[in-house]
Amino acid sequence: MKFFKLLTASLLVLAVAFSTVSAASDTEKINWFFKSKGDNQRPEIPLSGILKDSDALYIGPEDEKTVYLTFDAGYGNENVEKILDVLKSHEIKGAFFILPGIIKNSESTVKRMADEGHTVCNHTTTHGDMARVTDITDFKNELDGVANLYRESTGYEMADYFRPPEGSFSKRTLEFCKTLKVTPVFWSFAYADWDNSRQPSPEKAKEKILSSVHNGAVILLHPTSKTNADILDDVICELKDRGYSFGTLDELYGKVAK
């Protein structure tokens, strides 16, 4: 009898310990990344297994020569307008993940995004580390703040796509997204284009993009980048010459979501 009591107690301790480890792993910070192979090969996505039970988007089908242009826009400047001009001239629809700053400072630019058929998406209200958000109410507030401001300013509803700032998330983040019916969006290509004081040269940027693009590429660019604004037309023309087409997030979701 004493043996069974000890065994039961031990099992309870193990159960508590296991639940604690599980809880910790659910909130552990995860940083999204990919391993580029160059030569237009699809990259290695080490974290794809973590996303298998979610509807997260990060790459399209391997057998389709389609790319998806996505932009993280925290604020507005003349480069954002130039990028919109280029997309319009090619009749390409992109996805813009926005913060409150660009709505407050460049409302007409944000409205133009929607008017011209681009998908305007959620990049949170504070651009904080979403892996640290462990309460679903706080998480919802992060999404609602920018979405409500967008609605009030433009009259449009924000699309139900969400990109965590700097790609920081946790398993809990994915659970919150599923509960709130929001689709997380990551990427299979990005490069160091965000710092306007240290912009890469147009030649190096084009080489980086054109050597890394691949079937199903979800490309992350920052539209405030002068380099991106200067090279986007050339990049699109070259990709078209190579036989690539350009898809939307809704199209990608329809192909890969469970």
Regions found by a protein language model. Give the residues of each.
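Catalytic grooves of carbohydrate-active enzymes
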Residues: 214-250
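N-terminal pre-catalytic segment of deacetylase/amide-hydrolase enzymes
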Residues: 2-10, 14-70, 76-85, 89, ...
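Enrichment for repetitive, rod-forming helical segments
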Residues: 4, 9-12, 130, 170, ...
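Metal-dependent polysaccharide deacetylase catalytic core of the NodB/CE4 family, i.e.
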Residues: 65-67, 77-79, 84, 88-220, ...
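Histidine/acidic-residue-rich catalytic or RNA/ligand-binding cores of hydrolases
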Residues: 196-200, 230-234, 258
